[in-house]
Regions:
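Ribokinase/PfkB-type carbohydrate-kinase core domain
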Residues: 1-225
């Protein structure tokens, strides 16, 4: 049966850590990080690089999204903190919110794993473009105004609250699509298209948009996109 609401196209697992200045101060000492090294635009190839980046954002009071060299960096770093595993992606978060209001949605996913199966609305039909389980977690770092970190020659305090996202998400970079999603949306009244922001290859993006156009052709003529 076709749902009235169709949501796509990407999804991911979020590791939402609980800010802990004492942990950051220990990491500063462990990695011998100096204030002159703090920056928000350096490549992130190690835990040390990640700490430098987070502290750079904290000092600037700004937020952003950055690529890390490997998901293992995110996995290892997150273990230092209390954290909550949630789902990310505009479409999946919208589906979860609308289910609380009594509405089900058809979902297109690019990542499937135990967390996705557990956390998506259980009565919302979905297709996934991946045939095997995968995990490319997004590290979600949120800090409030006035968060202070003091260790070595570093003494910084955030001027405002903000949020930073770090990941190496192959599934969302490639954004493989499953055109079988068209079978779930033939009666949809609205189709939310999102998730292309992680893509880097122009020709691959062109190919994916052509796939989206073919899926859109399965919608009723009066559907909103």
């Amino acid at each position: 049966m076709s749902e009235k609401i169709a949501l796509g196209l990407g999804d991911n697992t979020d590791y939402e850590i609980v800010w802990n200045s004492a942990v950051f101060e220990n990491l500063i000492r462990r990695h011998d990080i100096r204030v002159a090294e703090l920056a928000t635009d350096k490549p992130i190839a190690s835990e040390r690089d990640l700490v430098i980046s987070i502290l750079g954002f904290l000092r600037a009071g700004s937020g952003g999204e950055r690529h890390v060299a490997a998901s293992a960096i995110v996995e290892d770093f997150a273990r230092h903190f209390a954290m909550k595993i949630t789902l990310g992606g505009t479409s999946v978060r919208a589906a979860i919110a609308m289910r609380k209001l009594g509405h089900t949605s058809a979902l297109h996913l690019v990542t499937i794993n135990e967390h996705v199966r557990r956390l998506i609305p259980q009565d919302s039909p979905y297709v996934c473009s991946n045939t095997v389980d995968s995990s490319f977690p997004h590290l979600i770092v949120q800090f409030d105004k006035g968060m202070r970190v003091c260790a070595g020659d570093i003494d910084i305090c955030s001027s405002r609250a903000n949020r930073i996202i770090y990941h190496d998400d192959t599934d969302n970079v490639i954004m493989r699509l499953n055109e079988g999603f068209g079978d779930l949306i033939t009666g949809a009244k609205v189709f939310l298209v999102s998730g292309f922001n992680a893509m880097r290859d122009e020709q691959l993006l062109v190919d994916r948009l052509a796939s989206v156009q073919r899926m859109l052709a399965r919608l009723p003529a009066d559907a909103q996109v």
